[in-house]
Amino acid sequence: MKNIICFLFLSIVGFTYAQKGDPEIIKKPINYSSERVNLSIDYLKSHYNITQNTATISPKMIVLHYTAGGTVETNFKYFNKTHLESARNTLKKQSTLNVSSQYIIDRDGTIYQLMEPNMFARHTIGLNYCAIGIENIGSKKQPLTEQQITANAQLVRYLTKKYNIEYLIGHSEYGAFRNSKLWKETDPNYFTIKEDPGKDFMNKVRLLVSDLHLKDKP
């Protein structure tokens, strides 16, 4: 009975938000310096065989993540650095370009934009050239909130309308795209197992945007 009530509630909320306008987004840009631009352009070429003179993407996909801890401020400070920290050896061997995402959502559902949605961010191996990343403050021990579920659904709806998005996945699901036409990673051994943001979270977000018919597989 509890699951039925939850399903009905989320369905009603989903319908309600389908009728609303764009979500409130607070711009909080990280330092996208000329060095970061050049590292991003190099990454596009070396990992995707994409040669261009701008650090931009053509979004087809949205990938939801969690930060595995911290606050908006601590994660902002981390993403704001151009270079990866030395402890992340596996990633650093591929490029010194720091990880980042286009958006980060706080536990109360506040949405922050860290860069323009069509700017390149390193957040999902093999798919960064076409994927918008949304980070959520939380972890396995600090489950994501109902406010974040709602905010993610609003943001997904807004971005889908703006960029004609086709796919919505969680970071843990990105492996399904290996060996597909969308997967452009040039190093066949460059892959890491992820578990964020969790099946329950993805199911709830997908329920709220089910009318968009976004795919989760190639």
How does the language model describe each region?
Residues 68, 130, 135-141:
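Cell-envelope and extracellular/periplasmic
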Residues 1-20:
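Bacterial Sec-dependent N-terminal signal peptides
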Residues 60, 99, 130-132, 164:
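Envelope-exposed proteins and targeting segments
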